């Protein structure tokens, strides 16, 4: 159960960030500015970092779902949750960034909602890591490399396609084809 909860969360999070790499770039810039670190990194870093982080999240999610690369996937999930949980507590208390951006514009959570979500996911990551050898594989060990390679190819291709064109799924409130006047009325 913990494995599938983690997998769904990481797949969804990685996918929505990969679909809108520019949106995630802006969120990373918000974080760097809020923590006074914007000048520490070159201008391309938020975009490149966003694409890599979305790919890592998507890879972790697919790996957890199929139980491939079990040690790597559970270790990365646990490390991410150990880092993100205290960070979201800080965000919830001091509110330097309005929302976490963990699910892009697809599902906007408050900082306190994000902290609660991360507590649950941290527990799930601990359980998945502790029982990683007991995770039942959905594919053979010989096919692990193919699933891993395809996963990374898919998510990077998706990110660069959406960067070059428009997002294939647009979660923004003022997406193309939407009546802006009606959107403003419902706010």
What is the predicted role of each segment?
Residues 1-18, 46-87, 122:
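Functionalized membrane-embedded alpha-helices
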Residues 38-45, 49, 69-72, 106-113:
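Membrane-interfacial loop-to-transmembrane-helix junctions in polytopic alpha-helical membrane proteins
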Residues 66-73, 133-143:
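Membrane-interface helix-boundary motifs at transmembrane edges
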Residues 82-135:
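Membrane-embedded alpha-helical segments of integral membrane proteins
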Residues 164-183:
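Alpha-helical transmembrane signal-anchor/signal-peptide segments
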């Amino acid at each position: 159960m913990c494995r599938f909860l983690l997998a769904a969360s990481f797949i969804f999070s990685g996918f929505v960030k990969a679909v809108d790499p520019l949106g995630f770039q802006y969120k990373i810039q918000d974080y760097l500015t809020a923590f006074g670190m914007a000048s520490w990194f070159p201008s391309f870093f938020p975009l490149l970092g966003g694409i890599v982080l979305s790919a890592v999240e998507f890879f972790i999610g697919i790996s957890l779902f199929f139980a491939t690369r079990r040690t790597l996937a559970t270790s990365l999930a646990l490390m991410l949750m150990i880092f993100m949980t205290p960070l979201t507590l800080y965000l919830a208390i001091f509110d330097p960034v309005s929302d976490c951006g963990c699910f892009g514009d697809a599902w906007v959570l408050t900082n306190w909602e994000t902290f609660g979500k991360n507590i649950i996911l941290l527990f799930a990551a601990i359980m998945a890591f502790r029982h990683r050898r007991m995770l039942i594989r959905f594919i053979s060990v010989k096919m692990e490399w193919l699933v891993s390679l395809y996963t990374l190819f898919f998510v990077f291709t998706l990110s660069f396609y959406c960067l070059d064109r428009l997002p294939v799924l647009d979660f923004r409130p003022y997406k193309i084809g939407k009546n802006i006047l009606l959107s403003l009325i419902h706010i």
